[in-house]
Amino acid sequence: MIWAWLTLSSGLLNALWSSQIKSRVQKEGALTFTISMRWGVALSLLPFALFALKVLSAKWWFLSTLSGSLECLSLWALTRGARHDYYSTYALSNVTPIFSACWALAFLGETLSPTLGLGVVLVVAGALWLYYRGHWSWWGLLGAIFGSLSGLFSKMALPESGFLLHSCFAFMVGAFLLTVGGLKGRTTTVPAIARNVWANRILIVLSALSTVVFYAALQMAPLSRVSTLVRVNLVFGFLLSYFHLGEKHGWKARGFGAILLLAGLVLVLWKP
């Protein structure tokens, strides 16, 4: 069950750094913040990735490039959707486990027991209950689809390289594509990105740790389980918003969503 502890740790670390997103985005802008975080994580992992560097097949480079590109598309979709309706976009982006389970069944030969299937449904229901505000967001759904496909290709690439090489390269691909798009659209600048990499150094360390342990877990365990269990970050995020940020409006209704999530996570961990 090492993979489970790694996934839970990734969820906690993710919640810790992402709880600071709102204030940072308001100050720096969504795209500049996102790009600086991606470059920061990629560069912080680079020394370890170089140490683990070895000859890799063309298939690995193709799969890892696809993974990084699709993750970039997922972030782009979420950024677009958040401009119109942040909560609905974020809520629908968390239906990712459903798509991940479908890809795992179709392409990885994983099995989906009734217990695991119910766990996936409860986790997604809890995420929607926590954040959905009654408006449909195609951007959120697209973000979920792209994110789940990124996870699929990562799962395919990890056995050959290990988690350090793959995570570093995939993040670098995403950072490069986002930077090119941002510079072309004149929505960010290189000095702004560089300045924010340093300003966000603590968040980058937390995000890098979260990334490493997530991919380590994904290398060990089925995609359908890891993709669902990592949603524990939503529970940690709810607790941080209540106790640390003092966001107590509607906490009882949101708390029910957290309970659904926890029930689903227990089922995901359940081994018949």
Predicted regions and their residues:
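Membrane-interface interhelical linkers
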Residues: 1-69, 73-84, 128-141, 172-220, ...
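Structural signature of transmembrane alpha-helices in multi-pass secondary transporters
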Residues: 10, 41, 93-96, 143, ...
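Juxtamembrane helix-start motifs in multi-pass secondary transporters
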Residues: 30-34, 163-167, 226
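Hydrophobic transmembrane alpha-helices of multi-pass small-molecule transport proteins
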Residues: 40, 45, 99-105, 114-130, ...
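Hydrophobic alpha-helical transmembrane segments in multi-pass integral membrane proteins
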Residues: 45-53, 100-115, 148-166, 207-223, ...
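Specific alpha-helical transmembrane segments that line the substrate/conduction pathway
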Residues: 70, 79-121, 167-172, 223-243
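Conserved small-residue-rich
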Residues: 140-184
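C-terminal appended segment following the main domain
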Residues: 218-272
